[in-house]
């Protein structure tokens, strides 16, 4: 028994909405970074689902998904490095307190 495409799309929509809500409402930059990663994972679910159920099924969606995972890992590494440097300089990682470039 196969899972229909609509189930994958609803799941990806829920993941994306949860990530978007967290990215827009939370004030902790680590949580915002995690929510952005959640949104990227929703995109990966869509890529794989459309690859499986598309007009010409193949591995294109999986390849794009692996590329997206690689980019997300690099983004997370750079984001965490920036957060560590920010914490060393400002002693905080809350968005409200680090919104300016001034020391």
Curated annotation (Swiss-Prot):
Cellular compartment(s): Cell membrane
Residue ranges crossing the lipid bilayer per the database entry: 3-23, 30-50, 66-86
EC id: 7.1.1.-
GO molecular function, one term: NADH:ubiquinone reductase (non-electrogenic) activity
Keyword rRNA processing assigned: no
Chief location bin: membrane
Source superkingdom: Bacteria
InterPro entries according to UniProt: NADH_UbQ_OxRdtase_chain4L/K (IPR001133), NUOK/Mnh_C1-like (IPR039428)
BP GO terms, sorted: ATP synthesis coupled electron transport
UniProt membrane topology term: Multi-pass membrane protein
Gene Ontology CC terms, in alphabetical order: NADH dehydrogenase complex; plasma membrane
Chemical reaction(s) catalysed: a quinone + NADH + 5 H(+)(in) = a quinol + NAD(+) + 4 H(+)(out)
Primary enzyme class: translocase
Keyword annotations: Cell membrane, Membrane, NAD, Quinone, Translocase, Transmembrane, Transmembrane helix, Transport
Pfam families, alphabetized: Oxidored_q2
Function according to Swiss-Prot or TrEMBL: NDH-1 shuttles electrons from NADH, via FMN and iron-sulfur (Fe-S) centers, to quinones in the respiratory chain. The immediate electron acceptor for the enzyme in this species is believed to be a menaquinone. Couples the redox reaction to proton translocation (for every two electrons transferred, four hydrogen ions are translocated across the cytoplasmic membrane), and thus conserves the redox energy in a proton gradient.
Subunit: NDH-1 is composed of 14 different subunits. Subunits NuoA, H, J, K, L, M, N constitute the membrane sector of the complex.
Family, similarity comment: Belongs to the complex I subunit 4L family.
HAMAP family, A to Z: NDH1_NuoK
Name the record gives this protein: NADH-quinone oxidoreductase subunit K
């Amino acid at each position: 028994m196969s899972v229909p495409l609509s189930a994958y799309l609803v799941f990806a929509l829920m993941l994306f909405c949860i990530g978007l809500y967290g990215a827009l409402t939370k004030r902790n930059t680590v949580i915002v970074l995690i929510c952005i990663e959640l949104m990227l994972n929703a995109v990966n679910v869509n890529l794989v689902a459309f690859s499986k159920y598309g007009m010409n099924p193949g591995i294109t969606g999986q390849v794009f998904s692996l590329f997206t995972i690689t980019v997300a890992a690099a983004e997370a590494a750079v984001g965490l490095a920036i957060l560590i440097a920010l914490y060393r300089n400002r002693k905080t990682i809350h968005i409200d307190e680090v919104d300016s470039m001034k020391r």
